[in-house]
Amino acid sequence: MYNLDTELDIESQEVWERWRTEVDKGQTPQRIDKYLAEHMTGTSRNRIQNAADAGNIWVNGKPVSSNYKVKPFDIIQILLDHEPHDYTIHPEDIPLEIIYEDDDVLVINKPAGMVVHPGHGNYEHTLLNALAWHFRDKLDINDPNIGLVHRIDKDTSGLLLIAKTPEAKTHLGKQFFDHTTERTYNALVWGTFTEDNGTIEGALARDNRDRTIYRVWDMEENPNAKEAITHWRVLERFPYVTLVECRLETGRTHQIRVHMKTIGHPLFADEKYGGMEVLKGLRTQKYKQYIQNCFALCPRQVLHAKTLGFTHPRTGERMHFDSPWAEDMLNLINKWRNYEPNTLGGR
């Protein structure tokens, strides 16, 4: 059984709900929309039918219509877009840094501090308001069949992919579902590593005590926890912090931030996950002031969506994009590159 987490706020929701199951051996023939409605708690049959109409239900790897009759041992996959929002996104003339655009897709470099999606009283100055302006005479960003294919956090900078047609959104959504996209992030984390690379595996769900954050769960303890895998490698070492590259095998909310904290390396300046404290280094007042100056230089989690790779939904061409660090992150990294411990009271 699958239960959608209805408590998720819009900004932290993943764009898609993903579900996969194998039909029991004793299952009698039944329409797939009815079967899924019975097995997916809180999901309407109409929403499931819409997913089928969009080509987002697959049985044994092939798309099926809502009247398909399930059989024992069928492998069912479904990709559900979230329910349409009940408000209108109004155009705002907000500059966008466009990396690539054609008739099917748009790739942008999002600045830190920009909310991706309106919600909870924050209905202006978001990325979708900017997209509504950008598309104003050509596309309606309020159409749920186009738009965001994935999200990044408000205070994370970097690459975002937008679908401009229903066909592109379905095609790209399936790539994210199948983990055939390539995404790497650069992050500055607290502490040093003895290894050069590693993999973190840990299912993620909201923390019961603080619903604004996520934590790693045993999936038997919390059936709503979602599998998450992060591969990391060291890019550059500094005395008390490390620049790492994180490659996502899955794309869960706050995945890198939670996984790095779990292994003892919170992201630098990540207030939500404990990175806004002096966790490593000297006890001198000069060093503490140095860290405070670093926090002031880049007052947000030091995380940047650096690269993005996917197959073009129309041409089949493999696309790859790379974006430069935001200025605040670049200035902070350069500050650590010039770090001189002797001037701060010794090591």
What are the language-model segments listed below?
Residues 1-347:
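RNA pseudouridine synthases
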